[in-house]
Amino acid sequence: MGGTFDPIHHGHLVAASEVAAKFGLDEVVFVPTGQPWQKSHKLVSRPEHRYLMTVIATASNPRFTVSRVDVDRPGPTFTIDTLRDLRAERPDADLFFITGADALAQILSWKDVDELWSLAHFVGVTRPGHELHDMGRDDVSLLEVPAMAISSTDCRTRVGAGNPVWYLVPDGVVQYIAKYGLYAAPANAADLTPALSGSDDQARTE
């Protein structure tokens, strides 16, 4: 499951669990982006913060793991590079790439799209009330997940306004955000990194 995870919230976790159950997945690998292209107009939390919050959030589920392939790779994050790295680590696995359905609609503009189809089955998750458009491909599935009504943007806004995010994000992540003062106003520049400008893919689950 690829995403910025800034912060990871219960919507991400429920979506991962629902997809795992529907498709009989043995493992869900969460892959926090390194330097996301499509957040070019925003500052995002440093990759290490987002990685550690994801580790904390997934620790209690033995089916969930977290990969550093995007965090450790220098330069911008492209889904094709993520999938190539995961394929190299798991050459015999059937890979499913979980992302937001709105992001999936842009897949034809992604880097090396023809190779993407050969590397993984794509699953787009969305919130209730969001219209799902069938892409007409056997290697693309769409799944409605009620908890996806939660968004990372709303969580950041709530923290910045001094409002609680308990029960929107896992307890350990709430404590991590408070410990490092993430999303508080004014933000600590040392905890932020600019996303790279560009027009390519990396529109994943927020």
UniProtKB/Swiss-Prot annotation:
Primary enzyme class: transferase
| Pfam families, A to Z | CTP_transf_like
E.C. code: 2.7.7.18
Q: Which residues form the signal peptide?
A: none
One GO term in the molecular function aspect is: nicotinate-nucleotide adenylyltransferase activity
Quote the InterPro entries the UniProt record gives. Cyt_trans-like, NadD/NMNAT, Rossmann-like_a/b/a_fold
Q: Which UniProt keywords are given for this protein, alphabetically ordered? A: ATP-binding, NAD, Nucleotide-binding, Nucleotidyltransferase, Pyridine nucleotide biosynthesis, Transferase
Catalysed reaction(s) here are: nicotinate beta-D-ribonucleotide + ATP + H(+) = deamido-NAD(+) + diphosphate
- Annotated pathway: Cofactor biosynthesis; NAD(+) biosynthesis; deamido-NAD(+) from nicotinate D-ribonucleotide: step 1/1
Coiled-coil stretches noted in the UniProt entry, renumbered to this chain: none
Q: Which GO biological process categories is it annotated with?
A: NAD biosynthetic process
Give the domain of life: Bacteria
What family is reported? Belongs to the NadD family.
What does this protein do, in the record's words? Answer: Catalyzes the reversible adenylation of nicotinate mononucleotide (NaMN) to nicotinic acid adenine dinucleotide (NaAD).
What the entry lists under HAMAP family is as follows:
NaMN_adenylyltr
Write down what this protein is called: Probable nicotinate-nucleotide adenylyltransferase
This protein's species is Paenarthrobacter aurescens (strain TC1)
Give the classification, highest ranks. Answer: Bacteria, Bacillati, Actinomycetota, Actinomycetes, Micrococcales
